[in-house]
Amino acid sequence: MRLVFAGTPEPALPSLQRLIDSDRHEVIAVMTRPDAVAGRRGRPSPSPVAQLAAAHGIPVLKPARPNSGEFVAELSALSPDCCAVVAYGALLGDALLAVPAHGWVNLHFSVLPAWRGAAPVQAALAAGDEVTGATTFQIERSLDSGPVYGVVTETIRPTDTAGDLLERLSVSGAGLLEATMDGIEDGTLTAVPQPPEGVSVAPKVTVDDARIRWELPAHVVDRRVRSVTPNPGAWTMIGDQRIKVGPVTVAGDGPKGLEPGEIRVDKKHIHVGTGSDAVLLGTVQPPGKKPMNAADWARGARLDENGWAR
């Protein structure tokens, strides 16, 4: 089939590469978000998807208004059979959805109807799910509610961060997306409506959402920190500094009797109290510095062992 691929960030790259390498499909164009300012230099930079497409000589479309009549006409002129979407980053209107004969097929990183929305991987980790996955489905106007073509599942490991889990899902999901395109082309695949039961939502994670709530039980703090690692990154205030915090370890044999947010420092460890057991900090990142071992930072900062994280 003649395909247009719509995507923007790194997790979309395995899917794009898989379709480029396919001997059954031709990626005739890539649709991605406009160049965004990135890095300290503040210069606009093409998205990862745009860079990969350009490396393969594939035309790159960067509409500022993808639902405008002008862009709908531009896409229609390409006569795509189907459009594949992985983390494009904008909602698509009816006129755009009507362009390809086989519609738009989205790869979503959850087992729908669970975790519809912008942050399904983060939501699954924060909730303590043991299994998640990826789903291909036909895009409709309502968010992530279209009929499903296929699903792959992935076991969530006890130490998974959002980055770890998304990396695995982006690879397994790429195979699912290619298989879905194959099935649509040869007519062997039919989309099945999502069940009305089991719907949950996963809105975009904000910086405020990533602030550690030390009053929560230790196992919940652990999950929530991993769910926002590496982005936007868990954080807390220690003194007057906002400190980013890497994954923590529940310390059942750690200091007892610490209040939520109370810090206990020794030569090799920093423990922080929660609503249950203490947790052991692994890495921290002070403002303007690189991540470092938490105990090393505490020594250099002369952190008061009776300090508080809040």
Swiss-Prot record:
Keyword Transmembrane helix on entry: no
Superkingdom in the source lineage: Bacteria
Listed GO CC annotations: cytosol
Entry GO MF terms: methionyl-tRNA formyltransferase activity
Keyword Protein biosynthesis set for record: yes
Catalytic activity: L-methionyl-tRNA(fMet) + (6R)-10-formyltetrahydrofolate = N-formyl-L-methionyl-tRNA(fMet) + (6S)-5,6,7,8-tetrahydrofolate + H(+)
Binding locations of (6S)-5,6,7,8-tetrahydrofolate: 110-113
InterPro entries tied to this protein: Fmt, Formyl_trans_C, Formyl_transf_N, Formyl_transf_N_sf, Formyl_transferase-like_C_sf, Met-tRNA-FMT_C, Met-tRNA-FMT_N
Keywords from the UniProt entry: Protein biosynthesis, Transferase
EC numbers on record: 2.1.2.9
Broad EC category: transferase
Protein family according to the UniProt entry: Belongs to the Fmt family.
Functional description taken from the UniProt entry: Attaches a formyl group to the free amino group of methionyl-tRNA(fMet). The formyl group appears to play a dual role in the initiator identity of N-formylmethionyl-tRNA by promoting its recognition by IF2 and preventing the misappropriation of this tRNA by the elongation apparatus.
Protein name, as recorded: Methionyl-tRNA formyltransferase
